[in-house]
């Protein structure tokens, strides 16, 4: 019972080794047991033969002695005795030879057995070494198995922990998903409310503008009525002249028509302190809608018949905005100037003589203005802004008409197409969007692959300047890239000459280039020792006749180059104390306006 317990206490591998040793002992003992028994018998026979040989040798010596001691009766050996002794000697000799032969065989057998024993000993040593190695391997494997069991336990615990965490995260995810759904619904509701409030705000602004317009009209009517009541000095010569012009073949009798003509002549003859001053003051307080653009001032043929003058003198320096001014643009009639700044407003200014008089502001943007453009008639103003949207106002009543949203980044440029019914906008989100103002929707979105800093348009092509140093040419009809041109720096601005055959570009490598659109070749490169592009949206401009280009530098100087020679015509400084962001040249060719990162705008002309 105790042996059974001890055997049960042994590990299985020990019992396995013990059984293998017993099996090997049985196999080896069966193989050599017969040999060992035969060997023992041979040893016994050898000992027996040795004893017999010694006995025979003793008898051999004893027989002659006996014969010598006891010879025949006559004291001589007879023949029979001699013959017997000879036969006995031969027999003994043969037995001895046979014994020696067997002894040699046994000796050889002993040697062979010794060799076999040595081989077996070596095999046993090798087996013992293998057994020791196997035991060591078993020990290592047991240790490794123990480590693996420990790791398995750790992994099972970690797996259980992960399962618990996963279950907790799943519960959390389900809760967060519900919150997200609820938040999305709330966000949608807030967006809807926000859009409604924006619409109400736009309506409120439009109503306020309408009220202001009505108040101005009422004030104008009142002052006109008061001015009409004032006594007006009459010059007799004028009355006589009017009468002669109006009634050369009539009598001198006064008629109602003649009375009206005299009244009109009297009003025209009023001195500066009378009716005209009152009307001028009234119009000076009105918005820009009081100045409709004269049709003869609208530039139907750009660049034709313009008297372009290179600016030399600062006529007017004024604070245009509360902060940085990013954009400036003249109306087609050259009388109205628009500026856009980081104060989220577009301001309108009237340019007359040497002054710029503030006429009103266009509100509705939620972030800084980045780009401004008038339509070809000067009736609408388009502005891009940092709130991911573009907006359109009517100039005559300062009302917000359209808000174009859809970009996911700040809109850096927006331009009218030539039909004034479509718009192209470029954004920091690396897309260009094509808008239809009639349907008020985005017709197409094109992924450009890089942030768009500026846009210009021709009849069939849109050209965009990008952050990746490339100018891309897009076909309006297919809205695909026709070609690309890579410059040495990031593109900050683009402009077209009046004939729309040359493209002006400005880049961050401080170079301006004129590109011939007919040959796709760089026609002229402009640079100057002190000129440095101040930002990624520094705007440059052609003169109305395409003979000059103007750009502002980072140190606040205004540079003018000749397109024909490529040389600097004029450098104007000392007015701006910060980097110039944008430059505009009036369609009449008489004025240039520059705006900077401070709040200043400078009106330049040649004097």
From Swiss-Prot:
Keyword Membrane attached = yes
Give the originating organism.
Pongo abelii
UniProt xrefs under InterPro entries: ATG16, Autophagy-rel_prot_16_dom, G-protein_beta_WD-40_rep, WD40/YVTN_repeat-like_dom_sf, WD40_repeat_CS, WD40_repeat_dom_sf, WD40_rpt
Q: Name one GO cellular component term.
A: axoneme
WD repeat ranges per the UniProt record: 320-359, 364-403, 406-445, 447-484, 486-525, 532-573, 575-607
According to the UniProt entry, where does the motif Caspase cleavage sit in this chain? 296-299
* Entry function: Plays an essential role in both canonical and non-canonical autophagy: interacts with ATG12-ATG5 to mediate the lipidation to ATG8 family proteins (MAP1LC3A, MAP1LC3B, MAP1LC3C, GABARAPL1, GABARAPL2 and GABARAP). Acts as a molecular hub, coordinating autophagy pathways via distinct domains that support either canonical or non-canonical signaling. During canonical autophagy, interacts with ATG12-ATG5 to mediate the conjugation of phosphatidylethanolamine (PE) to ATG8 proteins, to produce a membrane-bound activated form of ATG8.
Q: Where is this chain's protein located in or outside the cell?
A: Cytoplasm; Preautophagosomal structure membrane; Endosome membrane; Lysosome membrane
Q: What is this protein called?
A: Autophagy-related protein 16-1
Domains: what does the record tell us? The WD repeats are required for non-canonical autophagy but not for canonical autophagy. The WD repeats are required for the recruitment of LRRK2 to stressed lysosomes.
Record PTM text = Proteolytic cleavage by activated CASP3 leads to degradation and may regulate autophagy upon cellular stress and apoptotic stimuli.
* Lineage, opening ranks: Eukaryota, Metazoa, Chordata, Craniata, Vertebrata
């Amino acid at each position: 019972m105790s042996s059974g317990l001890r055997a049960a206490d042994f590990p299985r591998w020990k019992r396995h080794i013990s059984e293998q040793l017993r099996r090997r002992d049985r196999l080896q003992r069966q193989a050599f047991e017969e040999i060992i028994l035969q060997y023992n018998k041979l040893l016994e026979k050898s000992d027996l033969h040795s004893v017999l040989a010694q006995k025979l040798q003793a008898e051999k010596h004893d027989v002659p002695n006996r014969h010598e001691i006891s010879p025949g009766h006559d004291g001589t050996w007879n023949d029979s005795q001699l013959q017997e002794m000879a036969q006995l000697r031969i027999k003994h000799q043969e037995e001895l030879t046979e014994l020696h032969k067997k002894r040699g065989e046994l000796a050889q057998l002993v040697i062979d057995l010794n060799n076999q024993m040595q081989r077996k000993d070596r095999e046993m040593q090798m087996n013992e070494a293998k057994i020791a190695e196997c035991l060591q391997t078993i020990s290592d494997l047991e240790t490794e198995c123990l480590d693996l069991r420990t790791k398995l336990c750790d992994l099972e615990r970690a797996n259980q922990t992960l399962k618990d965490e996963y279950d907790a995260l799943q519960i959390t995810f389900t809760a967060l998903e519900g919150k997200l759904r609820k938040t999305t619904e709330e966000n949608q509701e807030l967006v809807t409310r926000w859009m409604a409030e924006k619409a109400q705000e736009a309506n409120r602004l439009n109503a306020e503008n309408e009220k202001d317009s009505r108040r101005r009209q009422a004030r104008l009517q009142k002052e006109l009525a008061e001015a009409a009541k004032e006594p007006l000095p009459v010059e007799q010569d004028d009355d006589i002249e009017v009468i002669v012009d109006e009634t050369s073949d009539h009598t001198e009798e006064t008629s109602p028509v003649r009375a009206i003509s005299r009244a009109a002549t009297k009003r025209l003859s009023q001195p500066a302190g009378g009716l005209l001053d009152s009307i001028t003051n009234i119009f000076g307080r009105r918005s820009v809608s009081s100045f409709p653009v004269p049709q003869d001032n609208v530039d139907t043929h750009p660049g034709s018949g313009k008297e372009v003058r290179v600016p030399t003198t600062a006529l007017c320096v004024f604070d245009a905005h509360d902060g940085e001014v990013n954009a400036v643009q003249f109306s087609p009639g050259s009388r109205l100037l628009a500026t856009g700044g980081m104060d989220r407003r577009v301001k309108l200014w009237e340019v007359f003589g040497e002054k710029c008089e503030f006429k009103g502001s266009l509100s509705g943007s939620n972030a800084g203005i980045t780009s401004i453009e008038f339509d070809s008639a000067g009736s609408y103003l388009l502005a891009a802004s940092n709130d991911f949207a573009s907006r359109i106002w009517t100039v005559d009543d300062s009302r917000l008409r359209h808000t174009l949203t859809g970009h996911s980044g700040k809109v850096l440029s927006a331009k009218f197409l030539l039909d004034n019914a479509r718009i192209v906008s470029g954004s920091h989100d690396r897309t260009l969007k094509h808008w239809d103002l009639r349907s008020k929707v985005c017709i197409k979105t094109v992924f450009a692959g890089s942030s768009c800093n500026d846009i210009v348009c021709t009849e069939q092509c849109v050209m965009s300047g990008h952050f990746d140093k490339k100018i891309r040419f897009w076909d309006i009809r297919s809205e695909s890239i026709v070609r690309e041109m890579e410059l040495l720096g990031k593109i900050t601005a683009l402009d077209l000459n009046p004939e729309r055959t040359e493209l002006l570009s400005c880049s961050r490598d401080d170079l301006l280039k004129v590109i011939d659109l007919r040959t796709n070749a760089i026609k002229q490169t402009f640079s100057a020792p002190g000129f440095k592009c101040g930002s990624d949206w520094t705007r440059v401009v052609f003169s109305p006749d395409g003979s000059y280009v103007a750009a502002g530098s980072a140190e606040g100087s205004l540079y003018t180059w000749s397109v024909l020679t490529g040389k600097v015509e004029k450098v104007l400084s000392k007015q701006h104390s910060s980097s110039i962001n944008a430059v505009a040249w009036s369609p009449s060719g008489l004025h240039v306006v520059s705006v900077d990162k401070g709040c200043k705008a400078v009106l330049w002309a040649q004097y």
